């Protein structure tokens, strides 16, 4: 039983690390799309800034909702729903032709970020790891989120430079598919 508990804890930590690494990295890459999207939809930076602000508001609104889903059903269900919203919002962002779709994509994307963000992931890790290793495991998972910003933001910049901004978002969608596996 102890071995199973240890293996389960390790899987939850690895899954949490991957989820936060990818979701934080992609979420914090959003600013790199300011110029390409603003030029594409022929607006100033204020529309894009407003959409990103809405994204962060949706993270704040969605976090307690996904926390309640995690409490009532499981962290896996909440994480999977979050990843689905995350992918839909990210994909819609690649289809943006005007400010309305940009804002809608960020509403959905932000809601998804809440589901595969710290509230759900750290709750799952905190339940899976007990005792003296709990704070260490929570720190490792949060460090993975920071590592995601360190790795994925430059990767996104490279993808934008090597292809167009819409294709780079589709590449990020493809990378994000790994989150489905680790949300289970």
Q: What do the predicted segments below correspond to?
A:
Residues 76-79:
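Primarily marks hydrophobic transmembrane alpha-helices of the MFS/SLC 12-helix fold
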Residues 37, 115-129:
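Intracellular juxtamembrane helix-capping segments at the cytosolic ends
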Residues 89, 100-108:
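Paired small-residue
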Residues 141-184:
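Helix-loop-helix hairpin linking two adjacent transmembrane segments in secondary transporters
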Residues 62-74:
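Helix-to-loop junctions at the C-terminal end of transmembrane segments
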Residues 28, 56-64, 149-150:
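Residue-level signature of mid-helix packing/kink "hotspots" within the transmembrane helices
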Residues 84-97:
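C-terminal ends and interior cores of transmembrane alpha-helices
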Residues 42, 74, 95-97, 130:
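Helix-breaking motifs and short loop linkers at transmembrane-helix boundaries and internal kinks
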């Amino acid at each position: 039983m102890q071995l199973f508990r240890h293996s389960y804890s390790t899987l939850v930590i690895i899954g949490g690390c991957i989820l936060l690494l990818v979701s934080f990295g992609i979420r914090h890459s959003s600013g790199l799309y300011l110029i390409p999207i603003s030029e594409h939809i022929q607006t100033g930076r204020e529309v894009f800034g407003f959409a990103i602000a809405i994204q962060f508001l949706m993270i704040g609104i969605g976090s307690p909702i996904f926390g309640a889903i995690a409490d009532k059903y499981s962290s896996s269900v909440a994480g999977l729903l979050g990843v689905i919203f995350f992918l839909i919002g990210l994909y819609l962002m690649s289809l943006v032709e005007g400010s309305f779709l940009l804002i809608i994509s960020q509403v959905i994307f932000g809601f998804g970020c809440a589901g595969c963000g710290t509230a759900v992931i750290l709750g799952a890790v905190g339940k899976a790891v007990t005792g003296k290793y709990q704070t260490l495991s929570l720190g490792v998972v949060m460090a993975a989120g920071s590592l995601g910003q360190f790795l994925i933001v430059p990767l996104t910049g490279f993808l934008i430079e090597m292809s167009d901004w819409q294709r780079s978002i589709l590449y990020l969608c493809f990378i994000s598919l790994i989150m489905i596996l680790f949300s289970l």
